[in-house]
């Protein structure tokens, strides 16, 4: 008897397309939505459901790569208006331990910096920022948490030497609220992507291998990986260099002529209205500006409000900014 089975299956995906889906999945580890965009860039139109079936059929569906859709969050209107900054925390073990430093543009999601670090001490972190500033310019604002190295736990005021160095570039610093990681939602979400990428590509076995790995991940994230929040575009398509250039020898602050300007002593203290007040040890010998608000005064260093002081009791506290995400 002759078989009635058709010689070809009209619903079977072209083998070349299936092979390409598998190649892209193995290369990046991304889901069907992103792979669909990559294929379209190559002139291959494949339905999302078909890509998912190929992934499942070839045993490539790994639950850890499935992510929840991004929440709609606050977004700055232009590049370099604000960068979000964070240390990922320990990745790897032993001599391969690494704490990646991430610097992300809020508007475009462009990753201006991704550096392997072993320590949160001043010099290596400052060098990473300086390299970023020399490559991309200076942002208006940096958003960060209350962690070391930008938040100096050794100082009553919380300011660190790194914070002061950053402010000398006339960058306004904004610190997220305590226990509010969602304030830095974009860089926190990137850290989830980073962790998945490292697992997919393989965790380095020595510290020296982190640098090329992070460079590859950064290149893919900025120029290849489609972003849902950007209508499946890439961050590089929306990012522009800052017009503000890095100044290796910044001048002293220039405050408005009507301002009350005081020099902080070598212990971070100053006198105002008969009160001995504290600014920050990290601001020793620097010029600060005082702005009165009824019974309190706000201390500014350059364009960043750093502390709020009671003119009745002399007690001071960190200046609290409204939360943004």
Model-assigned labels for residue ranges:
Residues 162-247, 295-297:
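Charged alpha-helix within mobile-element recombinases
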Residues 21, 35, 51, 86, ...:
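Mobile genetic element proteins and their domesticated derivatives, centered on retroelements
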Residues 1-91, 160-163, 234-243:
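Basic, flexible linker segments flanking DNA-binding modules
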Residues 220-325:
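C-terminal, beta-rich DNA-binding module of retroviral/retroelements integrases
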Residues 45, 49, 55-111, 118-140, ...:
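Mobile-element integrase/transposase regions
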């Amino acid at each position: 008897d002759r078989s009635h089975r058709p010689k070809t299956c009209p619903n079977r995906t072209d083998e070349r397309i299936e092979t390409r889906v598998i190649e892209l999945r193995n290369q990046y580890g991304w889901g069907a939505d992103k792979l669909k965009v990559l294929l379209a860039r190559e002139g291959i139109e494949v339905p999302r459901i078909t890509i998912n079936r190929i992934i499942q059929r070839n045993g490539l569906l790994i639950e850890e790569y499935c992510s929840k859709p991004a929440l709609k969050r606050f977004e700055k209107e232009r590049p370099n208006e604000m960068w979000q900054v964070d240390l990922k925390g320990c990745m790897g073990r032993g001599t391969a331990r690494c704490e990646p430093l991430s610097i992300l543009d809020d508007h475009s999601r462009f990753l201006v910096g991704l550096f392997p670090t072993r320590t949160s001490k001043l010099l290596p972190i400052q060098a990473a920022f300086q390299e970023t500033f020399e490559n991309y310019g200076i942002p208006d604002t940096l958003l960060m948490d209350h962690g070391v190295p930008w938040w100096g736990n050794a100082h009553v005021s919380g300011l660190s030497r790194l914070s002061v160095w950053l402010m000398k570039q006339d960058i306004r610093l904004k610190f997220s609220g305590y226990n509010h990681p969602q304030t830095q939602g974009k860089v926190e979400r990137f850290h989830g992507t980073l962790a998945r990428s490292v697992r997919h590509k393989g965790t380095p076995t020595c510290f020296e291998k982190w640098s090329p790995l992070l460079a590859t991940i950064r290149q893919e994230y900025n120029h290849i990986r489609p972003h849902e929040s950007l209508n499946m575009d890439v961050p590089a398509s929306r990012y522009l260099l800052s017009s503000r250039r890095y100044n290796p020898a910044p001048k002293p602050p220039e405050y408005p002529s009507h301002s009350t300007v005081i020099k902080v002593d070598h212990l971070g203290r100053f006198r105002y209205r008969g009160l001995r007040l504290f600014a920050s040890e990290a601001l020793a010998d620097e010029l600060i500006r005082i702005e009165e608000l009824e019974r309190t005064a706000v201390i500014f260093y350059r364009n960043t409000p750093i502390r709020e002081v009671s003119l009745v009791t002399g007690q001071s506290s960190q200046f609290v900014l409204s939360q943004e995400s």
